[in-house]
């Protein structure tokens, strides 16, 4: 950026030098008058035209240089602000991800993506039986929150949000029994893995909505093209979390500090703030298989989850959060 400023100043100084010699033009006119008396009008006219065209070319170059310098300044500002035109990385297969080193994956966004399948069948092609589900991965691609509409007298609707969390919201390494019945229906029960992730999104009006994206204790059943189940949504904050006034569920003050005595700390409007609620809630998810590969035991699909947001330990009414994305799993 400093080099761009220096180049701009240099060109501006050059432009001043070029425009300064007004006396040179008067001298040229006097020379033209003398030449006219000796019959040299044509040559002087050529000289004048040549000088004017050269001057126009030079000023044009100066103008272009100033534009280039301004563009360099704007480009430098974009670089400093961290602007990037790069999109999401190409989705890789499980084997391709495993073949990469840490430095090849670092900073690319691949670690936040679920693998895909190369080839395979467009349908669920696994035979009936009991399988061990491993390496299950749930990657959100869309977060919408049900909130009051911008239009007056309009009912609440799901609104698009802006993700405020870094690329750490994908659930991975989830395991559990997976059963395929003789009629083609499936059942999956989640037992272990990285099954929750704290996420914060921002509504168009600026309100931020934190929630715990999870599939904890999921029990989903149905046909491969749509099997649904409920799961547990733990409290966003634990019982030992203290609010700004030192109140907590299992520790801290019972009432807000500096409130007058006489039972005011237990008034109805303050109960939700004073009495912390860490009870879990329930969410629901629907999964669909889009491709399977029995040779490698891999299966992928899409999902749509509906769950409540954070309640600030019972002090706020939760919002409905709809999460859509893709999932991947291995059956052994």
Swiss-Prot record:
Alphabetical keyword list: Chloroplast, Manganese, Membrane, Photosynthesis, Photosystem II, Plastid, Thylakoid, Transit peptide
Q: List the InterPro entries hit by this protein, alphabetically.
A: OMP/PagP_b-brl, PsbO
Name under which the protein is recorded = Oxygen-evolving enhancer protein 1-1, chloroplastic
User: Where on the tree of life does the source sit, at the highest rank?
Assistant: Eukaryota
- UniProt keyword Plastid, yes or no: yes
GO cellular component, alphabetical, reads:
apoplast; chloroplast; chloroplast stroma; chloroplast thylakoid; chloroplast thylakoid lumen; chloroplast thylakoid membrane; photosystem II oxygen evolving complex; plastid
Q: Which PANTHER family match?
A: OXYGEN-EVOLVING ENHANCER PROTEIN 1-2, CHLOROPLASTIC (PTHR34058)
Report the sequence similarity comment from the record. Answer: Belongs to the PsbO family.
Please give one Gene Ontology molecular function term for this protein: oxygen evolving activity
The miscellaneous remark of the record is: PSBO1 is the major isoform in the wild-type and it cannot be fully complemented by PSBO2.
This protein's species is Arabidopsis thaliana (Mouse-ear cress)
Q: Which gene encodes it?
A: PSBO1
Protein location: Plastid, Chloroplast thylakoid membrane
**Tissue expression as described in the entry:** Leaves.
- Biological process annotations from GO: photoinhibition; photosynthesis, light reaction; photosystem II assembly; photosystem II stabilization
Question: Transit peptide range?
Answer: 1-58, 59-85
Biological role = Stabilizes the manganese cluster which is the primary site of water splitting.
What's the subunit arrangement here?
Interacts with CV in the chloroplast thylakoid membrane and in CV-containing vesicles (CCVs).
An example Pfam family from this entry, by short name, is: MSP
Membrane topology category: Peripheral membrane protein
């Amino acid at each position: 950026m400093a080099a761009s400023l220096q180049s701009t100043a240099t060109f501006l100084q050059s432009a001043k030098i070029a425009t300064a010699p007004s006396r040179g033009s008067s001298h040229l006119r006097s020379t033209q008058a003398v030449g006219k008396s000796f019959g040299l009008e044509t040559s002087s006219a050529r000289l004048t035209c040549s000088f004017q065209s050269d001057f126009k070319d030079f000023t044009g170059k100066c103008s272009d240089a100033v534009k280039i310098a301004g563009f360099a300044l704007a480009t430098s500002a974009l670089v400093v602000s961290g602007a990037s035109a790069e999109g999401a990385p190409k989705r890789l297969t499980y084997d391709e991800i495993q073949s990469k080193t840490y430095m090849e994956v670092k900073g690319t966004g691949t670690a936040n993506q679920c693998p895909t399948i190369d080839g395979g069948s467009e349908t669920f092609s696994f035979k009936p039986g009991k399988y061990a589900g491993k390496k299950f991965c749930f990657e959100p691609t869309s977060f919408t929150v049900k909130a009051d509409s911008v239009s007056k007298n309009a009912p609440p609707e799901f609104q698009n949000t802006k993700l405020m969390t870094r690329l750490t919201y994908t659930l991975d390494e989830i395991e559990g029994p997976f059963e395929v019945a003789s009629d083609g229906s499936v059942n999956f029960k989640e037992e272990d893995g990285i099954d929750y992730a704290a996420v914060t999104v921002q509504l168009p009006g600026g309100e931020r909505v934190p929630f715990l994206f999870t599939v904890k204790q999921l029990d989903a059943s149905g046909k491969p093209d749509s099997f649904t189940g409920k799961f547990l949504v733990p409290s966003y904050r634990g019982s030992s979390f203290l609010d700004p006034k030192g109140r907590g569920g299992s520790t801290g003050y019972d009432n807000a500090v500096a409130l007058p005595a006489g039972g005011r700390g237990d008034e109805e409007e303050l109960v939700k703030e004073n009495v912390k609620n860490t009870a879990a809630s329930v969410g629901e998810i629907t999964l669909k298989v889009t491709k399977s590969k029995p040779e490698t035991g891999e299966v992928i699909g899409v999902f749509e989850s509906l769950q409540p947001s954070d309640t600030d330990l019972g002090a706020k009414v939760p919002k409905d959060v709809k999460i859509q994305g893709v999932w991947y799993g291995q059956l052994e």
